[in-house]
Amino acid sequence: MKGIILAGGSGTRLYPITRGVSKQLLPVYDKPMIYYPLSVLMLAGIRDILVITAPEDNAAFQRLLGDGSDFGIRLQYAVQPSPDGLAQAFIIGEEFIGNGNVCLILGDNIFYGQSFTQTLKQAAAKTHGATVFGYRVKDPERFGVVEFDENFNALSIEEKPQQPKSDWAVTGLYFHDNRAVEFAKQLKPSARGELEISDLNRMYLEDGSLSVQILGRGFAWLDTGTQESLHEAASFVQTVQNIQNLHIACLEEIAWRNGWLTKKDVETRAKHLEKTAYGQYLLHLIGK
């Protein structure tokens, strides 16, 4: 299983903030936004990850994350020349994906909830078909919407329907078998000129291999596409961390708990950051 983070786009809804920096490099409380989707892939046990960016932002992501060795992972980078749809990520990443399965996550989505690691690993363990993650919303017409039966098999999937068949939005996290690459190549641009992820998932639906994993009560899915939602996400992270004294999306901690970094590795990393609360958290974590 390999992972792809799609961190392209121009972030126009956040102008003028994003005129000079990628949205996914903006801070969400105490970490760059890209840390949050990266942490999800790491929690799923995925170590080989491709970060797809806009051409002008690629170097900045590489400066921030390097080759991934600081976090016990292996990072590669690619560019999306123009924002031509989420499903294009599978075409861009074809060589990287190879013959295995793949998890795609959007670079501006934040997930938090109990037992999330177990949920992710269950989805990653599936060898056939695709899994989407549903989250109940009050305004489903703003999202891709999935309808499913009592066994969580998808019955329909639509992009921003005027009359939604359910109130379960499809989040920006998708697990696919290797057919995703060929399915993406068969797609034609939608009315808005993009290769739609909903159309790709519908191909799995049509052969009966699209399942739905529910993110239910007590779970948070945060979009960061507007100034208001970006502020709300930062406030959420701050509140949870202050109450629990545990960090959300601490990549070094996840790598250490996964056995990908040693205590010495974490200590070395922490000492570079010891003047920050983040660095102090890492030192406390390993008992220093």
Swiss-Prot record:
Q: Which EC class does it fall in?
A: transferase
Catalyzed reactions per annotation:
dTTP + alpha-D-glucose 1-phosphate + H(+) = dTDP-alpha-D-glucose + diphosphate
What InterPro entries does the entry give?
A: G1P_thy_trans_s, NTP_transferase_dom, Nucleotide-diphossugar_trans
Q: Which UniProt keywords apply?
A: Magnesium, Metal-binding, Nucleotidyltransferase, Transferase
Under Gene Ontology molecular function, one entry of this record is: glucose-1-phosphate thymidylyltransferase activity
- Give EC number(s), comma-separated: 2.7.7.24
In terms of superkingdom, the source organism counts as Bacteria
Look up keyword Hydrolase and say if it applies: no
Residues binding Mg(2+): 108, 223
- List the Pfam families hit by this protein, alphabetically: NTP_transferase
Q: Does the keyword Metal-binding apply?
A: yes
One GO BP annotation is: biosynthetic process
Q: Which cofactors is this protein said to need?
A: Mg(2+)
Cofactor: binding comment: Binds 1 Mg(2+) ion per subunit.
The free-text function statement in the UniProt record for this protein reads: Catalyzes the formation of dTDP-glucose, from dTTP and glucose 1-phosphate, as well as its pyrophosphorolysis.
Subunit and interaction comment: Homotetramer.
Entry's family note? Belongs to the glucose-1-phosphate thymidylyltransferase family.
Protein name as it appears in the record: Glucose-1-phosphate thymidylyltransferase
User: Gene encoding this polypeptide?
Assistant: rmlA
